[in-house]
């Protein structure tokens, strides 16, 4: 078993990271931060000054104090530091169910003490129930804080060791047993940012369970768990149906959905699952009425409105798609709980010899000074949660009908600034004092104005755009709409009119007010399209003149993200490849991996996968669910023998190939389809 090196962050003498973690307990909202491991070291040949070092961990076995003490004991010997010795260690693991920080103190040599600390800093005794909860939270954090291969999560928090919490069927039984025992308390853990109110089937526990089943392909285990839970509460049917669909048992899924909806006709998770399934089969006509009923059953949830918008997009009812998008309730994005640590005295990031390879060296990354200001100002890359999903839907419409047609539809359904002024002048001339029906908006309950901070991308009504936003290409700048002004009392959103074929938007009275956040999205999309058009035009001109089109690696990375946001996969792959030709980039390699998946290029997929896995190991991550899923699907489709042969034939050092063989070994341990061959 190849393991990563151990990062060391040296704490400043004036601050204790353990005390700061204790102070931050009361501000934790959901699953909590990664585990903290704090060691005290002193020189081997003297009893001189002691120094505190720490790192973070996800995925370690937190089922008992003994397992955490065992982890600390693995850190006693360090091949990178032979002048100091470890005298004590403290392992802190957050229990999100009971809002306690479980701690194990190990004296070396000496005793082991376990206890827990509450939000007030009081020291309490740890019970068996506490350890069960802590173990489950630890597994869920391992999946929640895992990197998708792009390196974004790894770069966000320095010095985190990531382990796979479930490496065999025995560990799986332990995990699923804990999940079954604590399932009905799962709503206490919170939920993904797209969910307004965590409930029995939409929370971090159910998300983690579905993620585990999808990653490992252990559909039978997931079905068995949810079938048992469904006997206690029929609401679990939506989760069971999703696992049936994942496991290619669609007939059972359809039968289950039919029975469950007869029992609970207004259960929105069931309706959403059914609508999603109908959409995947190209039956938008069936999905439409289901999605409408889902909106009625949960009008304050973003997911139901987003699904209805997807249905309208698939039916090419662009006006209804925009009106539905305008009605989406938007939520302020709440990021995952992360460590809030003081500035360290210094940081030591040793590299394991098994993960060292010149080809994946990204240490020569260039700085921001080589990135054009216009590229750095693109704010769409910062969208998260509901705003990211809404932007994705808007860009999907743009890809299918074009920017000009989108602006035309927008002006047909929303009140534009120019016509509002004209209408207001007419009203003043007629001395009309009654409120016009045209100012009644299709309102969202959210009053959040998630205005992107980039100055050059978004303008409020009446503002003058900066010179950098002036058009120098063929992308027309959108006119401003009249936006709905947020108020303290906002009515619940109402579904758009049900019969779009007979709607006429030519009259001012039939139009809607555009929510401010959606108006902002149009302006951000305009800036994305403007930069994209300039890039493609310049690239074509250079190509026609047989000249090299030069950008820095960071610029190619940004352009790849831009094309990906705009649903231009071929252009994105071109940018990723140009970036990788200059230096290794995990984000670029993850983009190329997606391109190889799309093209069905098995050798290309495995080549990208080997390099990504090695880069992950280099930065202390032994586990990425996304990469496990990719290699599992390859083994399922091509067979384990072929996959192993292609890996072994790759012209990279053997110790690098062994890291990928270790990932493939997980599939054999779980007896995944294709691993027997």
Spans of model-derived segments:
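Non-TPR docking regions that flank or precede TPR/alpha-solenoid scaffolds in eukaryotic proteins
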Residues: 1-677
């Amino acid at each position: 078993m190849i393991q990563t090196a151990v990062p060391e962050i040296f704490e400043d003498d004036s601050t204790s990271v353990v005390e700061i973690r204790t102070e931050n307990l009361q501000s934790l909202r959901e699953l909590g931060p990664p585990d903290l491991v704090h060691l005290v070291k002193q020189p081997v040949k003297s009893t001189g000054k002691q120094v505190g070092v720490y790192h973070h961990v996800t995925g370690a076995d937190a089922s008992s104090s003994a397992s955490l003490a065992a982890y600390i004991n693995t850190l006693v010997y360090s091949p990178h530091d032979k002048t100091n010795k470890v005298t004590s260690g403290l392992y802190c693991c957050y229990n999100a169910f009971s809002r306690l920080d479980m701690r194990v103190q190990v004296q070396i040599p000496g005793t082991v003490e376990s206890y827990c600390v509450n939000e007030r800093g009081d020291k309490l005794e740890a019970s068996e129930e506490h350890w069960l909860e802590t173990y489950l939270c630890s597994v869920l954090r391992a999946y929640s804080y895992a990197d998708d291969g792009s390196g974004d999560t790894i770069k966000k928090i320095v010095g985190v060791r990531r382990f796979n919490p479930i490496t065999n069927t025995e560990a799986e039984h332990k995990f699923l047993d804990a999940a079954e025992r604590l399932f009905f308390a799962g709503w206490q853990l919170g939920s993904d940012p797209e969910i307004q109110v965590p409930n029995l089937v939409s929370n971090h526990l159910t998300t983690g369970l579905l993620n585990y089943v999808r990653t490992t392909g252990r559909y039978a285990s997931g079905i068995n768990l949810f079938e048992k839970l469904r006997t206690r509460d029929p609401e679990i049917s939506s989760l069971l149906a999703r696992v049936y669909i994942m496991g290619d048992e669609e007939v059972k899924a359809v039968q289950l959905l039919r029975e469950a909806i007869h029992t609970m006709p207004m259960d929105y998770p069931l309706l959403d699952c059914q609508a999603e399934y109908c959409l995947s089969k190209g039956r938008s006509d069936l999905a439409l009425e289901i999605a409408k009923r889902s909106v009625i059953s949960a009008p304050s949830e973003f997911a139901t409105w987003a699904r209805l918008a997807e249905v309208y997009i698939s039916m090419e009812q662009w006006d209804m798609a925009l009106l539905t998008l305008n009605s989406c309730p938007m939520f302020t994005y709440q990021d995952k709980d992360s460590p809030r640590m003081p500035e360290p005295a210094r940081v030591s990031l040793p590299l394991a010899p098994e993960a060292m390879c010149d080809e994946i060296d990204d240490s020569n990354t260039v700085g921001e000074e080589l990135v054009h200001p216009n590229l750095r100002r693109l704010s769409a890359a910062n969208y998260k949660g509901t705003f990211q999903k809404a932007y994705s839907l808007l860009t999907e419409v743009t890809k299918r009908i074009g920017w000009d047609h989108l602006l035309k539809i927008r002006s047909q359904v929303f009140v534009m600034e120019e016509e509002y002024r004209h209408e207001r002048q007419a009203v003043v001339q007629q001395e009309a004092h009654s409120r016009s029906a045209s100012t009644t908006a299709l309102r969202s309950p959210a009053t959040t104005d998630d205005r992107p901070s980039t100055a050059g991308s978004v303008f409020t009504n009446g503002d003058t755009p900066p010179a950098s936003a002036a058009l120098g290409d063929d992308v027309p700048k959108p006119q401003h709409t009249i936006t709905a002004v947020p108020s303290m009392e906002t009515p619940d959103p109402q579904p758009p009119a049900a019969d779009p074929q007979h709607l006429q938007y030519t009259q001012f009275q039939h139009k809607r007010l555009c929510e401010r956040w959606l108006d902002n999205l149009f302006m951000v999309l305009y800036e994305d399209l403007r930069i994209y058009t300039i890039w493609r035009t310049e690239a074509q001109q250079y190509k026609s003149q047989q000249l090299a089109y030069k950008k820095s690696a960071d610029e190619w990375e940004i352009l790849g993200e831009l094309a990906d946001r705009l649903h231009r996969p071929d252009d994105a792959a071109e940018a990723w490849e140009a970036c990788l030709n200059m230096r290794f980039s995990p984000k670029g390699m993850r983009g190329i991996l997606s391109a190889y998946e799309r093209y069905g290029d098995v050798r290309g997929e495995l080549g990208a996968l080997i390099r990504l896995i090695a880069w992950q190991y280099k930065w202390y991550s032994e586990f990425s669910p996304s990469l496990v899923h990719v290699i599992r699907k390859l083994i399922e489709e091509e067979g384990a023998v072929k996959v192993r042969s292609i890996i072994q034939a790759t012209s990279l050092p053997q110790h690098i190939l062994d890291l990928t063989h270790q990932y493939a070994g997980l599939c054999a341990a779980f007896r995944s389809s294709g691993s027997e061959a």
